[in-house]
A protein has these predicted regions:
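Short, hydrophobic/aromatic-rich segments at coil-to-beta transitions
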Residues: 1-7
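Serine-hydrolase catalytic machinery in alpha/beta-hydrolase-like enzymes
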Residues: 7-100, 114
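Primarily recognizes the serine-hydrolase "nucleophile elbow" in alpha/beta-hydrolase
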Residues: 84-153
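Conserved small/polar residues in nucleotide/adenosyl-binding loops
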Residues: 158
Length: 159
C-alpha cells in the first residue's frame, strides 16, 4: 500500500494538499474531507483511510484552503464546495477505473453533501458520512440537513 502526496488545483490561484492512499487490490475510491477542527492528517482521518485501505478502498484525503493556510475559521461554503469538486476531479484522474464515492467527517461531510445537492459531483456513486453536524452544539435546528433531500445518490452515515 502506498500513500502519495498530491496537489489539488481549486482555482486559478489556489491549490491544496492531498494524500492519495491506494491498496494493491483497490475496488473503490473514497474522496474523504476532514472536519472543521482537524486536517487530513489527523489521527481519525489517518485511521479511517488505513482501515478502508485494509478493506480494499483507496482514499483521497485533502485539505480545505483554510486548513492549508493554518487558519481556524472554516471556508465559506462556495469555496469549500469548489474544493470538494476539485478533489473529486483529481480522484477521477487518479482512479479512472474505480467506482467513486465522496464524503467526510463532520464539516467535510456537510460540505460534500451540499456540493452534491447543488449539482451532482461527477462520477460519484454515493456519499459516506463519518458523523454529520445536524446543528451547532446546544442550538438544535434543522437548517444544516435540509439540503439532504436534494442529494440524489445513496448516502451512508457511519457513527
Amino acid at each position: 500500500m502506498t500513500v502519495d502526496p498530491v496537489t489539488i488545483r481549486v482555482d486559478e490561484t489556489r491549490t491544496v494538499s492531498g494524500l492519495f492512499q491506494v491498496p494493491e487490490r483497490a475496488f473503490a475510491c473514497l474522496v474523504l474531507a476532514h472536519g472543521a477542527g482537524a486536517g487530513m492528517a489527523h489521527r481519525f482521518m489517518t485511521a479511517a483511510a488505513d482501515g478502508l485501505a485494509t478493506r480494499g478502498v483507496a482514499t483521497l484525503r485533502f485539505q480545505f484552503p483554510y486548513m492549508e493556510a493554518g487558519s481556524k475559521r472554516p471556508d465559506r461554503p462556495p469555496l469549500a464546495h469548489a474544493t470538494v469538486r476539485s478533489a473529486v476531479t483529481t480522484a477521477i484522474r487518479l482512479t479512472p477505473n474505480l467506482p467513486l464515492f465522496a464524503g467526510g467527517k463532520s464539516f467535510g461531510a456537510r460540505m460534500t453533501s451540499q456540493a452534491q445537492a447543488e449539482a451532482p459531483l461527477p462520477d460519484v456513486r454515493g456519499l459516506v458520512f463519518f458523523g454529520f453536524p445536524l446543528h451547532p452544539a446546544n442550538k438544535p435546528a434543522d437548517e444544516r440537513a435540509r439540503h439532504l433531500a436534494e442529494v440524489k445518490v445513496d448516502r451512508k452515515s457511519v457513527v
